[in-house]
Design a protein with these regions (language model features):
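Conserved active-site and SAM-binding loop architecture
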Residues: 1-186
Length: 186
């Protein structure tokens, strides 16, 4: 039996499988700068944005925090399954959160342009931009059900309310295109 066979499976899509995410991982890296606990959805937004942008300047924005959060989650999962903590660095080689890549609308690896998706909803604007060759490097949506649908379609948890400082601080500050839902005004 290989190390890969003994590692606990960590599936983000299973974690959010219910009607509303009511989960929280507490670890040394799940604290905000002010000492409050970072909500699970924000932890998953950081991790999923990092994994989809790894190896790019956009991924660098999330790298340090994402790797620390992934280590917390991995240690919690492996300890609860086996009674002892496993080595995160070895586990990382076996693609934690592999299900983020098993989605219908994967991002382009070599995009023609980048964009952010504010007021993301379930991702209609993102789909149009991806069809034109773009790659989303930041998304935000405050509605929990829309976040879940977005995750299942794109493998990425959008950040939450963009009026909150912690969400603003996650933004890469590189804007190519943004949309706003105009249905209410039409």
């Amino acid at each position: 039996m290989t190390m890969k066979d003994t590692l606990p499976a960590i599936s983000l899509t299973e974690m959010v499988g219910g009607s509303k995410v009511k989960m929280q991982y507490y670890g040394p890296n799940s604290l905000n700068e002010d000492g409050t606990f970072m909500p699970f959805s924000e932890q998953m937004a950081i991790i999923s944005h990092y994994l989809h942008n790894e190896g790019t300047p956009y991924g660098n924005t999330y790298e340090k925090k994402a790797l620390a959060l992934m280590e917390d989650i991995y240690k919690a999962k492996s300890t609860s399954k086996s009674g002892m903590a496993a080595d995160f660095n070895e586990a990382q080689q076996y693609s934690l959160f592999n299900d983020l890549y098993k989605v219908p609308f994967r991002p382009h690896r070599e995009p023609k342009f980048t964009f952010i998706d504010l007021f993301a909803g379930i991702g209609g604007f993102r789909m149009a931009m991806q069809n034109l060759g773009g790659k989303c490097v930041f998304s935000s949506e405050w509605d929990a059900q829309a976040q879940r649908t977005y995750l299942l379609n794109y493998g990425e948890v959008p950040f939450g309310d963009i009026t909150k400082e912690e969400t603003k601080s996650s933004n890469t500050k590189r804007l190519t295109a943004v949309t706003e839902d105009l249905q209410a005004t039409s």
